[in-house]
Amino acid sequence: MYPSYALGAHGSIAAILSAAPHASVELWNAVKAGNHARALELHQKLLTLWNAIVSDNLPACTRYAQSLQGLPPTFSRAPMPEASPAQQAAIRKALEGLGALGGSREAAE
């Protein structure tokens, strides 16, 4: 998202915004404040999360990321599978890198 925001985009519609809302807002605010070093740092961390959630079951991976941050867990409906154990581990690791586990707002502070 950083390159788009830096070029003047007024926002975005992406699953990553739902998967890591606090870090996504901080990224937006950093670009608007001209703090491109912080924005790029957040962008790189969000890319790690994006690579963990993007798959044929993106909705399930996004919901899993949300549940790790304190939102009530939900389930997938057939034929969509739940996030696999490998996907869950990658998502957890990416959220740890953002400081976003358990509803924490560390990434946004």
Region annotations inferred by a language model:
Residues 2-109:
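Structured C-terminal cap/extension of enzyme domains
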